[in-house]
């Protein structure tokens, strides 16, 4: 089956068997001959002919049907996932062998290494010699003198997690639950490096958003003091990062193939990536998805903010991770400040592979450093939608004694409407700089805003969408938020008084119904929100087990309601690879979107962040020329480089948004990204770097 698919995608093994059974003797012989030809005659035609001639095909397949039916009744779920994994592994190794052998032949070279091309040992060594670890080891040696100091408290969490990792080193999955601001990133880095050994030589760091990828790459750079020897061994793998930073003039044409293959097969010792990327590898069915699958074996994978993944497939996620960990010698760390106990969704015997690294999470969550960091206030919350004017008056009153104020809306249009109101308020704009941050903002603008709000001397009011909940490292005095799900509210509280050096306050209000924004979300659909006194109590006491037990119970009930043909076990048993990928989509594709390239003038703040000005039209021309490149590897590598610069000009709009199409200079079909429409006079759609055209929501 794997051989027959190596020029295509894994689809359904069940359909493959049925297709074979329907074919006549001549077609089967033809298929087998094709296999022989594609494998350089490894299977000789005369042997195949005798095999077919002396065998009654119908009898053979009737026997196979009976055998499969009987086998299905006796095979365990563990055997099913093992066969599923083996099939995917064989397919991945076959593709890799094919690609490497072809590349060796075409380039007349010999590959000696088919895995990590970097040096993981230098990362381990430099980490142990870093200032932060020296400080932690010093505290470990001399004891923690003052637990009210937040850094000492972080050290306590760090050391407890390290101790429990050693105690449970035979487990495959580790849960790390600790409060926001407690140093989880550094703790997880230490744990992942501890899990490396002679056979386990690769680390994956997985985040739900590109903003988190960027933020944590910066954290790693800070930990390693921008040591180039370390940083060059850490690769960011996502849709917005170039495959190489080298100028095309410095890359020999034959090197493009190596750069592309390193990315396709993830030939790096330490990878920082997104959940979409890693799950394409974990459960994807296309050739491109499966290329690096074999690299997951003998690795360490760290998942951050897993509660942000689509909760309707939590059960499938933990089942896949648990099985792969056992079968492929993977160690998995799952961490969050709001961590659901996903082991509840597993069978009893499967839970034995999971260990908690913090034994008594209440000791930390209920400590006054974290628990009382933010006072929650419900004066503005009622089931009647709040008026903008009432919200504005409340903010004006609080602005007198607050330097940093954050207001989060869950609808981008609401954020933009309120931003205009705040900008026009003399009471607010006379003392505070008014800023807005949404999902449509590019990296340069986002970083500029973060710097402003983290500047101790600046007074700032930031209006934002829910992207602020994770992946944006800011610290404010007061926060206002449109309610949604309880897990979202806790993530929002993590943006307030992060330093724990002052008193912070959060005000919740109701304006937009979360059900209109969050589709197919168990938490939102079941009203697990702050209208409930029970949920208010959970948020106050940080007892998220009560909250998540309700969510997990709903998921378990829904799983029982699924038909036998539709459930996870049946899909795995029948090896329906394509169907599994469809059912485990982390992000639903929005087909009502169009991508536009606005040729606009970058703001001074954007230019400062980028380090140079970028001419949109010149970037567009380079992009069009790259699309004409005939060398495939060079084309893909150069596209990844130009795409980094295009991100400052690319925006997604709903198809029904009306723009002045007389500004369009070209409409070009892109093989990978679909249609991109070029708008030449882009400046008229922007004010101070903020898109102001149309009502269509682009992102969140």
Regions found by a protein language model. Give the residues of each.
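Walker A/P-loop
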Residues: 170-192
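Conserved Walker A/P-loop ATP-binding site and its immediately adjacent core
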Residues: 201-224, 238-241
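Conserved helicase motor
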Residues: 236-247, 410-413, 434-447, 465-469
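C-terminal helicase lobe and adjacent C-terminal extensions/tails of nucleic-acid helicase motors
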Residues: 325, 393-402, 408, 413-432, ...
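Accessory nucleic-acid engagement/destabilization modules that flank
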Residues: 1-126
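SF2 helicase catalytic motif II
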Residues: 289-323
